[in-house]
Amino acid sequence: MPAFDTPAMMLILWAVIGYGLGSIPFGLILTRAMGMGDLRQIGSGNIGTTNVLRTGNKGAAALTLLLDGGKGAVAVLLARAFAGEDAAQVAALAAFVGHCYPIWLGFKGGKGVATFLGLWLALAWPVGVACCLSWLAGAAVTRISSMGALVAAASSTFWLVLLDQGAGFVLGIVLTLMVFWRHRANIARLKARTEPKIGQKSA
C-alpha cells in the first residue's frame, strides 16, 4: 500500500486539489444563477470574465474575475500552508490547467487569465501586482482584452527576474506559453486586425 505522506504523493495530492479548485466554472455558474442562460451560448462561448461582460452585467463580470482569480490564489495558499513551496507551485499549475480544461465541461474551459493573475498574487505578490498592472495597461491602451492578457503573460517572466522571484521562473515560462496557446485564436484575429475591442460583440 503506498505511503500518502511521501513528497511525491503530497505533490500529486495537491495537483488533484489544485485542479479541482481550478475547474470550478464560476462564470457559467453565476450567469445561470442570475438567469442569463448558458454562457457557452453567448458571445464567444468562453466561460471567463470577458464573455460574462458581454452579457452586459458588469457586476457578474467583476464577480467572475474575483472568483476565478481567487480559486488560483486559494489553491496556492492552501498547498503552501500544508505542504510547502513546491506543492504551492504544483497546485498553481494544476489550478490553471483545471480552469482551462475542466473535466465537468468536457475539458472546454476558459483562457485562464484571471486564474493566472490570482495564482501569481498568492505565489509572489509583487509579481502578481506587476502582472495585474501590465494587464490593465495593455487593455487600457489597446482597448482589447486579449492584448492585456498577452501583455501580462509575456511580462511575467520579466517581473520574476526583476523582482528577484527566480524560484518561479520555470513555472512562469510554462504558464506564459499556456496563456499564449489558449489565446491562439485571438492572436490570429489580432494579426488580421479583426479582434473586437472591449464592449464590442465577439466575432
UniProtKB/Swiss-Prot annotation:
Locate the transmembrane regions by residue number. 10-30, 59-79, 87-107, 116-136, 160-180
Q: Which reaction does it catalyse?
A: an acyl phosphate + sn-glycerol 3-phosphate = a 1-acyl-sn-glycero-3-phosphate + phosphate
- Which InterPro entries does the UniProt record give? G3P_acylTferase_PlsY
User: Keyword set for this entry?
Assistant: Cell inner membrane, Cell membrane, Lipid biosynthesis, Lipid metabolism, Membrane, Phospholipid biosynthesis, Phospholipid metabolism, Transferase, Transmembrane, Transmembrane helix
Which pathway, metabolic or otherwise, does it act in?
A: Lipid metabolism; phospholipid metabolism
Keyword hit for Cell inner membrane? yes
Q: Which HAMAP family match?
A: PlsY (MF_01043)
What is the name of this protein?
Glycerol-3-phosphate acyltransferase
Source organism: Ruegeria pomeroyi (strain ATCC 700808 / DSM 15171 / DSS-3)
